[in-house]
Amino acid sequence: MESLIEKAKDGDQIAFTELMLQIKDELYKVAKIRLKNDDDVFDVIQETMISAYKSLKKLKHNEYFKTWVIRILINECNKF
């Protein structure tokens, strides 16, 4: 995962997509618990991916990537 994160930080969209695929089930579970409605869940996951992609260079510790994305997801859920 570490090398994918570095590639994604360098702008590799395929690496970023692979990272998201690796954690998609966890993102879905967290969002589903908070929102219940599948349409809202998918909207929030999409917004999370956009936000994470735009902010990826701000991630200071690559080992916390999944935690960082889940925190973004929770913040997005709170907007609903």
Predicted regions, residues:
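Alpha-helix N-cap and coil->helix boundary residues
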Residues: 40-44, 60, 64, 68
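Short coil/turn segments at alpha/beta junctions that flank glycine-rich nucleotide-binding fingerprints
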Residues: 34, 38, 55, 62-63, ...
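Short, charged helix-capping/linker segments at alpha-helix termini
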Residues: 9-17, 28-47
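Sigma70-family region 2
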Residues: 9-10, 49-64
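Hydrophobic-face residues of short alpha-helical interaction/recognition segments
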Residues: 27, 31, 56, 69, ...
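Residue-level preference for hydrophobic side chains embedded in well-ordered alpha helices
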Residues: 19, 23, 27, 48, ...
